[in-house]
Amino acid sequence: MGNDIEFNVFQKCWTISNDFGLNTDLLETNLINLGIVISLLIYFGKGVLSNLLRNRKLAISNTIRDAEERYKEATQKLEQAKIRLEQAEMKARNIRTSGLSQMEKEKKDLIDGTNGDLRRLEDSKNATIRSEKQRAIEQVQQQVSRSALERTLETLKNCLDNELHLRMIDHNIGLLRAMESVTD
């Protein structure tokens, strides 16, 4: 009889059937079933889970590595862009400085050239004025001389007689002889 009870208990806990099955009723399951299921899950799931975790870890590390490489490339490109920007700014300053100095030089050259042209024009104007003044003076002198000679001749014609005329000629001849003896 003791065996019958044990067999009945065994039969109640373990259902003997043709197919394998798990009892999903938590109240009817026992610790052995739970241990088997957990150990099977750990045994078979360990490889799958470790593969999944390893693949995920590799994917994350690859993503991080790629992100770090892109960050380094972006940093290098940023540094190169900063260097090019500084070079461009320096070149722009040099161009601006040389442009300003060239502009000042050309301005000075233009002012100097204009001043030179003004001086030459002023000198030309003054020379023209002097020559015109001299010509006017000479014309006036000629007219005055001509007028004086005409009046003198007129006066002499009216006042001179032959005797006065002869005395004047003798006097001038005497002056010429005196000058001749002084020069010898």
From Swiss-Prot:
Its main location: plastid. It is a single-pass membrane protein. Keywords: ATP synthesis, CF(0), Chloroplast, Hydrogen ion transport, Ion transport, Membrane, Plastid, Thylakoid, Transmembrane, Transmembrane helix, Transport. NCBIfam families: PRK07352.1. F(1)F(0) ATP synthase produces ATP from ADP in the presence of a proton or sodium gradient. F-type ATPases consist of two structural domains, F(1) containing the extramembraneous catalytic core and F(0) containing the membrane proton channel, linked together by a central stalk and a peripheral stalk. During catalysis, ATP synthesis in the catalytic domain of F(1) is coupled via a rotary mechanism of the central stalk subunits to proton translocation. Component of the F(0) channel, it forms part of the peripheral stalk, linking F(1) to F(0). F-type ATPases have 2 components, F(1) - the catalytic core - and F(0) - the membrane proton channel. F(1) has five subunits: alpha(3), beta(3), gamma(1), delta(1), epsilon(1). F(0) has four main subunits: a(1), b(1), b'(1) and c(10-14). The alpha and beta chains form an alternating ring which encloses part of the gamma chain. F(1) is attached to F(0) by a central stalk formed by the gamma and epsilon chains, while a peripheral stalk is formed by the delta, b and b' chains. This is ATP synthase subunit b, chloroplastic. The gene is atpF.
